[in-house]
Design a protein with these regions (language model features):
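Conserved donor-binding/catalytic core segment of Leloir-type glycosyltransferases
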Residues: 4, 176-193, 199-202, 215
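A conserved nucleotide-sugar
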Residues: 29-31, 195, 199-246, 325-328
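Short hydrophobic beta-strand element within catalytic cores of glycosyltransferases
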Residues: 35, 286-289, 299
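Short His-centered aromatic/hydrophobic patch
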Residues: 88-94, 114
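Aromatic "clamp/platform" in nucleotide-sugar-dependent glycosyltransferases that forms part
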Residues: 250, 269
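Conserved acidic donor-binding segment of nucleotide-sugar-dependent glycosyltransferases
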Residues: 291, 301-302, 306-313, 322-327
Length: 364
């Protein structure tokens, strides 16, 4: 099976990129080719690893002449390569890949990946309107949301996975004198990711006498919310949390920071999947998320982690409180979470699921 994947980003900063990178790390260089719509270090990294990589500078979608030129170039590549599967790794690349596949006479081989939970935004509606054999999703929640769009397209689900942590990687250093449980969030700084709500939850818990150090790992990836980091800093000052919060910004590898945490929180509501939670589970860290989106599909409340009833600060605080007061509970959840990860959510298991799903689509 020969696969041609179109990608919108030249950098590897978010969950969608992390999932695909994990898939590619075990893929055959001879059977997978990549077309990036912008240059960047990720494209260079994969080319250096031995993959056939082409970069087609697409520009912005609103630049119609650039869109047309990109579609025509992609159609040429598809005709030349004649892949068994054309996989557009986002709604954005579907807007280029689907017309290109049609021009090449291969619409029946076109698939796209919906990593987010569709909200009816114009780009999701337009991507769904274009021809596709199926739409891949990372969770049942994402698939159900996608199926609400029209025309209703066939969906399939491949749960993400995460590679085992490197044993040589040590923990990062935190400010001296922390001496309290460390609770962390890892992800780009955007309002829907919930850093603001988590700060407010920290303020509530502090008022109840439960102190912890909050570690926020991530930056303003892709410049999607440029004013948000300053907003978080203002909230920290207003709540008097200057000595109880560390913001480390964008880092190439969050693993050493995750290793310092007593609890890893995902405060998104909803979260499409939550690969970072798997990274915590793999390291034997207790995890907490919101009971919406993808996390409930692999976190069993009270057994392999904790699920807050919503992303509201009061509910986040209520869910986190038992973890703060009981090291024994944290250890119990961490052990069960790691067992769950090892059983079903390693990168090897993810690759097997992923390629089996594509093979099944090819033979139908």
């Amino acid at each position: 099976m020969r696969i041609l994947i179109t990608l919108p980003w030249g950098e590897r900063l978010g969950g969608a990129e992390a999932m695909l990178h994990g898939v590619l790390e075990g893929a055959s260089h001879e059977h997978v080719e990549l077309v990036f719509l912008q240059p960047g270090p990720w494209a260079d990294e994969l080319a250096a690893a031995g993959f056939r990589v082409e970069v087609v500078r697409a520009g912005r979608l609103r630049q119609l002449h650039r869109w047309l030129a990109t579609v025509l170039r992609l159609a040429q590549i598809i005709r030349r390569r004649r892949p068994d599967v054309i996989l557009n790794w986002s709604a954005k690349t579907q807007l280029y890949g689907a017309p290109a596949a049609a021009l090449a006479g291969m619409s029946g081989r076109n698939i796209w990946w919906q990593h987010s939970i569709a909200t009816g935004a114009w780009i999701d509606r337009l991507a769904t309107l274009l021809p596709t054999r199926a739409i891949g999703c990372t969770s049942l929640a994402a698939a159900r949301a996608q199926e609400q769009l029209r025309p209703r397209r066939r969906t399939f689900v491949v749960s993400a996975g995460s590679p085992p942590p490197e044993t040589s990687a040590g923990a990062a250093s935190l400010p001296a004198g922390t001496g309290r449980p460390v609770v962390g969030l890892v992800g780009r700084l955007q309002p829907w990711k919930g850093q603001q709500r988590m700060l407010e939850a920290q303020g509530l818990l502090r008022g109840q006498g439960h102190n912890f150090h909050l570690l926020i790992v991530g930056g303003d990836s892709y410049g999607l919310s440029p004013e948000y980091p300053a907003q978080l800093s203002t909230t920290i000052e207003q709540l008097g949390l200057e000595n109880a919060v560390t913001m480390v910004g964008e880092v190439p590898d969050p693993g050493p920071y995750i290793q310092t945490m007593d609890v890893l929180v995902n405060a998104s509501d909803p979260e499409p999947f939550g690969i970072v939670l798997l990274e915590g589970m793999a390291r034997g860290i207790a995890v907490m998320a919101v009971n919406s989106g993808g996390p409930p599909e692999f976190i069993e409340h009270g057994r392999t982690g904790v699920l807050a009833r919503s992303g509201e600060p009061s509910e986040l605080a209520k869910a986190l409180k038992p973890l703060l007061v009981s090291p024994q509970l944290r250890a119990k959840l961490a052990r069960a979470g790691r067992d769950r990860y090892l059983r079903d959510f390693t990168d090897t298991a993810m690759r097997e699921r992923f390629f089996a799903a594509l093979e099944a689509l090819c033979v139908q």
